[in-house]
């Protein structure tokens, strides 16, 4: 019996113990001195294997009980001990690697939307089926095939639209009275550049993506085409009605959308009138629809509203000399106009075209004129070749061609590129018919104007309101 016990003890490799139960009790639940902890996750656990020396405290506890009992009991204990599972080794939890790319937008917006949608599949806009004689397009196989062929075209538009939505929703939350217009405009423009991934400081970069045109911040009676020039100190006031109109583009696919901000609920009926008119225009637009029919529907919706200001009721009037327009690649104003009043234009919308449906309402005369300092400019597509005598004009034209092409720009954009003393050359390009200037457009002073706008795509099968969002 004693020999059997001795053999069992040798099998357990206990010859390193000193025989003092008290001194060895400290090793219960510990590894032997000098034995490193094993973090391998691959080692198999075997429930039928006796614990190795130093593998854990269980073996030591049973061993020291053996020296205090008769041999028969000791052998029984050894038999029991052989069935105890080996002490579990401490496993180190492996840290999961974080996947690259942010999953949410930052505040202020600075994460490119391509990081948020790594598969380059961007949310589609509002899908509206065609009606009347075009209702067949939704299920027509030939049209569906044509629609599938345009996937890259659609994804570029949808990416630009997602940029616009994220930037404007941040702007709506953060713009407050007391901010300068320069601060507001640059905040929006910086966000668009960051989210498209194109800062526009290197030659040609702005042609790949970024601002589709300068951020317009037209106040009160000014309806359109106002953005601050360098040195502008104008501050947004509590009683102001501000139109925020900006574009984002990817590879020249421009998404043009605008909204109006107020900080006094007295202007709500004015905003409701214009929003209703814009949505009416979107609803009526479609393949083979005549422009005159769209304008008549818009006017009827707009002019059914009135607004009370300081105890006086004002009818909301369409600004009759402002229009929506089609959008071509890298060209914000194509050759077609979408009127917002009844007229005789028999031009039709066509399959594959992109339109900016925008409406303007006013408490004034409903007619705008050029006023105030010009800030918006654009190279005229296919402008005739004209000899330029001013070297400053030649140099500036080169800068415009390489950085903007036919995309609109403003003076602040030239400042940002490091251009200096360019005004004389810029005016020479305008007078030569190479560059078009776009002065601010204003109704009578004391009146209030509002604007809402969306970009729509006339796809072969459906109409997609590409810039639609939860906000408007």
Curated annotation (Swiss-Prot):
Keywords: Aminopeptidase, Cytoplasm, Hydrolase, Metal-binding, Protease
Region (Disordered): 14-53, 86-119
Cellular component terms (Gene Ontology): cytoplasm
UniProt catalytic activity: Release of N-terminal amino acids, preferentially methionine, from peptides and arylamides
Residues bound to a divalent metal cation 1: 245, 256, 453
Entries under SUPFAM superfamilies matching the protein: Creatinase/aminopeptidase, Winged helix' DNA-binding domain
Catalytic class of the enzyme: hydrolase
CDD domains: MetAP2 (cd01088)
EC number(s) recorded for this UniProt protein: 3.4.11.18
Single GO biological process annotation from the record: proteolysis
Pfam family, one: Peptidase_M24
Residue numbers binding substrate: 225, 333
Domain of life of the native organism: Eukaryota
UniProt-annotated binding residues for a divalent metal cation 2: 256, 325, 358, 453
Biased composition (Basic residues): 86-101
Cofactor(s) for this UniProt protein: Co(2+); Zn(2+); Mn(2+); Fe(2+)
InterPro entries, per database record: Creatinase/aminopeptidase-like, Met_Aminopeptidase_Type2, Pept_M24, Pept_M24_MAP, Pept_M24A_MAP2, Pept_M24A_MAP2_BS, WH-like_DNA-bd_sf, WH_DNA-bd_sf
GO terms for MF: aminopeptidase activity; initiator methionyl aminopeptidase activity; metal ion binding; metalloaminopeptidase activity; metalloexopeptidase activity
PANTHER family named in the record: METHIONINE AMINOPEPTIDASE 2
Family: Belongs to the peptidase M24A family. Methionine aminopeptidase eukaryotic type 2 subfamily.
Function comment: Cotranslationally removes the N-terminal methionine from nascent proteins. The N-terminal methionine is often cleaved when the second residue in the primary sequence is small and uncharged (Met-Ala-, Cys, Gly, Pro, Ser, Thr, or Val).
Entry protein name: Methionine aminopeptidase 2-3
Source taxonomy: Eukaryota, Fungi, Dikarya, Ascomycota, Pezizomycotina
């Amino acid at each position: 019996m004693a020999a059997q016990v001795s053999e069992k003890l040798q099998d357990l490799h206990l010859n390193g113990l000193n025989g003092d139960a008290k001194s060895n009790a400290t090793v219960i639940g510990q590894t032997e001195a000098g034995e490193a902890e094993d973090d391998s996750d691959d080692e198999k656990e075997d429930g039928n294997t006796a614990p190795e020396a130093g593998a854990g405290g269980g073996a030591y506890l049973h061993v020291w009980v053996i020296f205090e009992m008769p041999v028969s009991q000791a052998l029984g204990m050894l038999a029991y001990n052989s069935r105890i599972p080996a002490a579990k080794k401490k496993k180190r939890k492996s840290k999961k690697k974080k996947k690259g790319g942010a999953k949410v937008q930052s505040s202020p917006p600075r994460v490119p939307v391509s990081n948020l949608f790594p598969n380059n599949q961007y949310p589609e806009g509002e899908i509206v089926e065609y009606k009347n004689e075009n209702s067949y397009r939704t299920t027509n196989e030939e049209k569906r095939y044509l629609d599938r062929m345009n996937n890259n075209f659609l994804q570029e538009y949808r990416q630009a639209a997602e940029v616009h939505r994220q930037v404007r929703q941040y702007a709506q939350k953060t713009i407050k009275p007391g901010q300068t217009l320069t601060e507001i405009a640059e905040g929006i423009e910086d966000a668009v550049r960051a989210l498209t991934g194109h800062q526009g400081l290197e030659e040609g970069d702005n042609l790949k993506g970024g601002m589709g045109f300068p951020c317009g911040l037209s106040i009160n009676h000014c309806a359109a085409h106002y953005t601050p020039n360098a040195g502008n100190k104008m501050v947004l006031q509590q009683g102001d009605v501000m139109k925020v109109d900006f574009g984002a583009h990817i590879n020249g696919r421009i998404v043009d959308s605008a909204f109006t901000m107020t900080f006094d609920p007295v202007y709500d009926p004015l905003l409701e009138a214009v929003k209703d008119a814009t949505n009416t225009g979107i609803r009526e637009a479609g393949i083979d629809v005549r422009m005159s029919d769209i304008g008549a529907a818009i006017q009827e919706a707009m002019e059914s509203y009135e607004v009370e200001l300081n105890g006086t009721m004002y009818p909301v009037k369409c600004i009759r000399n402002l229009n929506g327009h089609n959008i071509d690649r890298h060209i914000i104003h194509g050759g077609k106009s979408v009127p917002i009043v009844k007229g005789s234009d028999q031009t039709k919308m066509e399959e594959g075209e992109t339109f900016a449906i925008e409406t303007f309402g006013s408490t004034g005369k409903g007619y705008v004129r050029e006023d105030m300092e010009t800030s918006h400019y654009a190279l005229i597509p296919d402008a005739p070749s004209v000899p330029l005598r001013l070297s400053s004009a030649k140099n500036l034209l080169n800068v415009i061609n390489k950085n903007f092409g036919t995309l609109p720009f403003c003076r602040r954009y030239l400042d940002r590129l490091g251009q200096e003393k360019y005004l004389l050359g810029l005016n020479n390009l305008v007078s030569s018919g190479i560059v078009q200037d776009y002065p601010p457009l204003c109704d009578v002073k004391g009146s209030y104007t509002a604007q809402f706008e969306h970009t729509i795509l006339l796809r072969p099968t459906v109409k997609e309101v590409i810039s639609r969002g939860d906000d408007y």
